[in-house]
Amino acid sequence: MGSDHRLTTRQMAEFVANGFIRFEAIVPTEINERGIDEMRRLELERFAPAGLKPPHTGTPLEECYPAPSAIGEYLRLPEIRGIIESFVGANPAFDHDFTHHLQPHSAYLQPLHVDAITDSPDPTFDIQLFWYPHDVAPGEGGTRFVPGSHLRRVRSSGLDRYQHIIGEQQFSGPAGTVVVFHHGLWHAGQPNPGDGDRWMHKVRLNPTVPQVRLWNTDDLVELHNPPSDHIFARMLPDSVAQVLRTMHPWMSITDYRNEQVQRARLWRYLTGDDTYDVDHYLTRLEGRAALVGSR
């Protein structure tokens, strides 16, 4: 993270390759403790005639969760504001939130899903912040997710028959950890075999500005490889392309190469560089297409 709390180019590239980025214990203890109390109220009063309510969809984030809200205080932490700005700008729109609560020994689980019915082919994206206000030990049922699945363009419930995907992860970590998901990342809530209540607050945010170079770009020139960078020819050993070549365990060779193309397209959007490429795939296709158009 940069000195202004925005993300670095390397962190943005890791997000493009993996579909998520994690910040351990970034929320202070006092806010975590008050956050659980607020989540409890939201759960009880969200659909009641009166009481604590979530913001209206479309509200600018800066107008959401006014003081003394612990959720608002967490979202206004300089570190969290820098993370949000890096992805969706300084004042994105509130989409929705939800309090996920499981009592001890609850067997409830979600099927694998994405939080979108269907997606357009453009590279824009929402982010979802998952805030875990208490410790979650390994095996205690934290969110299950599939790294690198975020650019697959699937329908929301088309994944519910899939289980035990190689390389999937299950959240565990210290109190105050925040995990930021691309809205297309495959995930599922899991049972709570532990002896304590498990709480998590999710908020989805929509961009209101083009998502171009919103992060701290001080290291962009150093890491941003030319379109000629090619693993089978000449390549830079430490570059964005090297990060975007990340291969997740569930990928076949064909999946892997197709995902590289999707990542390169997303990186073009994020940087505003329409010539960017990883391993010549897009440049090759576009060069041939130009020949057809010139007949």
What feature does the model see in each segment?
Residues G173-H187:
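Conserved metal-binding segment of the jelly-roll/cupin
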Residues M1-N18, E24-D119:
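Non-heme Fe(II)-dependent double-stranded beta-helix
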Residues P28-T29, H100-L102, I117, V136-P138, ...:
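Short, solvent-exposed loop/turn segments at secondary-structure junctions
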Residues E45, L185, Q190-R295:
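Non-heme Fe(II)/2-oxoglutarate
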